[in-house]
């Protein structure tokens, strides 16, 4: 009897997005990308943070393309050899941010298709299972462009009420403002919030409960335009994330197992749990490489 071929899934485009800076969007993007690539998926990261392009220098490169996001957006360049750099991690590529003068922001504001340009372009990039887009930490046309280009938005939230309120005020308000695009066949992506930098002084249950209460109220009042949830997997504050960034490696390789007596998950466990919540359609594929998963 012949075995059925596994389903062919279309590329999923996920934005790591927040209207607030300093919530570890880049760290999440780099570590999720590295973990997914190590499981055998083809992953493309796009550094759309044109003000602080940290993701572009996070991983060492085996091949650096002559161009990057500027050529993609300004010139509609889609030749991988021109815009796609290869990291030292097998299966993990990146389109770097290369707009030091900040010209893209003005270009997008002046272009008739500025806010939807990336949506058209990114869907023409072949050969990837998942595309992860790191974003600028402020409400700009560049941030709106990434949201409208995405199939899923992952929004990091710090375990403090000020950050939670910014998520509720800034990110959800942006969805409200972009709702008119749905009339033209551009759906707004579902939204998943992840608690970042959780430490032992923070009461995760209280923060989680407070956010859930607000979201449930908004759901009852029909104020939420898309499916919105808070992930059950938090990212714990750990020196491993800073060390991994310094070494230019995914954190799951550095913090691969839970030491005896440790109560919080190791980074490998956290990345696996996050990926299972965010990308269940890919994580369940039987063809994935399971070696090295904690």
Task: Identify the residue ranges that each predicted region occupies.
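P-loop NTP-binding core
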Residues: 1-294
